[in-house]
């Protein structure tokens, strides 16, 4: 038998496959799959026979199975059939509120059927409880929440829904949360800059390119029957828990996160990426280290000492060193307000910027929730800041810093808030009384009035139609004799049409004073005669004393003589007006200015009344 051998090589191990039919020539035909032998040679000595190993592997022939790339099609078919069955069951179990419009059913069928959105929920916001009225109830009538599989699925669903609304209802949807390419590139640059800064500071950053577009929330106003659609990814939906926000008061407990393992801690919230997540950022601020204030009498005296010196660093140390409940924090803010009130009352110059930042720094979220005590305190503090420096803390700052803040936090605005703004507008001083400066002032008032729409007073009347509010509004329309808003006369006519015979004395006096300020005497007499009673004696309750004082203070001899000579004062006797001592003095002063002192007319109006 002839054999072919391989000489050993000095170096690394060399594995040689020794196939029997190529080595043993006398053997018969040999099948390749029956026997395979591998021989490994070593570079060590000949005696090291244990270093040589032979590995034999026997394999048996098995029938071929379906390759994995052919099984993919079958698996996808089974998956699609399962999804169709799930959608059929979901459509059967789809709950739509009773007495809902047909448009809601069509939109629901599109979202769950064609677009394949899951976990479909509808909240009926039409049933508004008077004890739980919030901004959510005023958004719309129906709030829809559904889950998408990815951000691309969210975007595609919005596009299809918008096409459907245009085709079926001729309406174009408004969306929040849809980022265009420019916004997305800007967002990526910010995240990259944040990541680089974290690396320089030795911190780990979770802002990776993979997580940039992993979550999304599309809030869509369909503009059809008050329907809003929220399309979220699963993780974002779990984070926001919008169900608890939109659910009625008696059903909120069903959607609360009871599992303590899912409730984020302070460290857990800090670890979650808060990119473009406002609600998560607010939660993080609420759970961070809070500053409480429980100050003993010695601490209060020290705090007052530092505040009077305007040593805000020392005051901050005293407040932060104490701990307690949020009620004590309210007391601390009240002490700060009282100190500022004393300084402003003494007409001392104060640093308004530092005083405002001190109050804001210690206004935590839990403190703000105590609305019964916090918001009146903040209103009084804002009025003091405006009184100390009207140029810095102007009416525009008050609109954003107080009114918009209070409204955005779900608190109800009241009559005193609007009055405070109007008084600030009237106190604002401009370098010149021009028409354009007056228009700028009233733009602030218009923005504020939009916030008070639908709000009522204790008498179930609109806040805008309050007597003091109307007087301040009319005063804000007139700067001097030459500068006034063109809408002044329209406002006066609207007040007459709205109230009619129910005009109060305060409203009449305000109208007369503003017309006298611009010296429109014809309109003034027209208004005065328009409210003359016609039902008989004893019915004239017009403010005669204020009317005569307005005429007398004008100093216009032509107007005064016209009032006296045309017999306007005779209506005092004709309508049996109650002549008070104040009215007697006003009549005497007016007749003295007209040169008719101790005249027959004076005796008829004043002395004749006293003789009766």
Swiss-Prot record:
It is a peripheral membrane protein. The keyword Cell division does not apply. Its main location: mitochondrion. Residues 1-14 form a transit peptide. One of its GO terms (biological process) is mRNA stabilization. InterPro entries: Atp25 (IPR040152), ATP25_mRNA_stabil_dom (IPR025210), NT_sf (IPR043519). GO terms for cellular component: mitochondrial inner membrane. Belongs to the ATP25 family. This is ATPase synthesis protein 25, mitochondrial. It comes from Saccharomyces cerevisiae (strain YJM789). The lineage of its organism: Eukaryota, Fungi, Dikarya, Ascomycota, Saccharomycotina.
């Amino acid at each position: 038998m002839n054999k072919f051998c391989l000489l050993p090589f000095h170096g690394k191990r060399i594995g040689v496959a020794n196939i029997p039919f190529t080595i043993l020539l006398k053997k018969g035909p040999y099948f390749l799959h029956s026997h395979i032998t591998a021989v490994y040679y070593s570079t060590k000595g000949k005696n090291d026979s244990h270093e040589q190993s032979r590995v034999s592997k026997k394999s048996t022939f098995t029938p071929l199975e379906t390759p994995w790339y052919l099984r993919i099609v079958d698996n996808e078919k089974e998956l699609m059939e399962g999804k169709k069955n799930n959608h059929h069951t979901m459509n059967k179990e789809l709950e739509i509120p009773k007495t809902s419009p047909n448009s809601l059913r069509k939109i629901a069928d599109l979202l769950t059927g064609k677009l394949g959105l899951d976990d479909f929920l509808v909240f009926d916001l039409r049933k508004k409880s008077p004890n739980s009225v919030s901004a959510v109830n005023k958004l719309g009538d129906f709030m829809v929440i559904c889950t998408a599989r990815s951000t691309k699925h969210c975007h595609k669903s919005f596009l299809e829904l918008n096409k459907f609304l245009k085709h079926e209802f001729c309406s174009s949807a408004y969306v929040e949360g849809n980022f265009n390419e420019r916004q997305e590139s800007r967002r990526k640059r910010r995240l990259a800059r944040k990541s680089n800064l974290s690396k320089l500071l030795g911190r780990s950053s979770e802002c990776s390119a993979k997580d940039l577009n992993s979550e999304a929330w599309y809030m869509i106003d369909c503009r059809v029957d008050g329907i809003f659609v929220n399309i979220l990814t699963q993780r974002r939906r779990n984070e926001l828990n919008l169900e608890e926000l939109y659910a009625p008061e008696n059903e909120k407990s069903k959607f609360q996160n009871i599992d303590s393992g899912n409730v984020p801690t302070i460290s857990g919230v800090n670890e979650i990426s808060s990119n473009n997540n406002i609600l998560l950022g607010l939660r993080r601020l609420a759970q961070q280290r809070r500053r409480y204030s429980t100050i003993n009498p010695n601490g209060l005296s020290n705090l007052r000492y530092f505040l009077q010196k305007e040593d805000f660093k020392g005051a901050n140390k005293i407040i932060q060193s104490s701990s307690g409940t949020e009620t004590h924090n309210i007391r601390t803010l009240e002490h700060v307000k009282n100190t500022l009130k004393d300084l402003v009352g003494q007409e001392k110059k104060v640093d308004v910027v530092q005083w405002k930042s001190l109050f804001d720094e210690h206004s935590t979220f839990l403190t703000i929730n105590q609305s019964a005590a916090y918001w009146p305190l903040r209103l009084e503090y804002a009025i003091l800041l405006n009184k100390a420096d009207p140029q810095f803390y102007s009416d525009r700052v008050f609109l954003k810093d107080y009114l918009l803040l209070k409204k955005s936090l779900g608190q109800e605005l009241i009559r005193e808030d609007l009055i405070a703004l109007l008084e600030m507008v009237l106190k604002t001083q401009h370098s010149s009384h021009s028409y354009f400066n007056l228009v700028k002032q009233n733009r602030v008032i218009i923005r504020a009035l939009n916030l008070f729409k639908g709000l009522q007073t204790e008498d179930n009347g609109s806040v805008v139609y309050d007597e003091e509010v109307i007087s301040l509004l009319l005063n804000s329309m007139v700067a001097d004799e030459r500068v006034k808003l063109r809408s002044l006369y329209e406002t006066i006519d609207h007040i007459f049409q709205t109230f009619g015979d129910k005009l109060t004395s305060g409203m009449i006096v305000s109208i007369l004073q503003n017309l006298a300020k611009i010296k429109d005497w014809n309109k003034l007499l027209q208004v005065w005669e328009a409210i003359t009673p016609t039902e008989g004696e004893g019915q004239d309750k017009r403010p005669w004393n204020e009317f005569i004082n307005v005429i007398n203070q004008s100093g216009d001899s032509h107007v005064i003589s016209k009032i006296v000579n045309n017999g306007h004062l005779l209506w005092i006797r004709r309508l049996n007006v109650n002549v008070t001592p104040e009215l007697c003095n006003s009549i005497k002063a007016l007749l003295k200015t007209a040169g008719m002192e101790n005249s027959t007319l004076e005796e008829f109006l004043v002395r004749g009344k006293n003789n009766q």
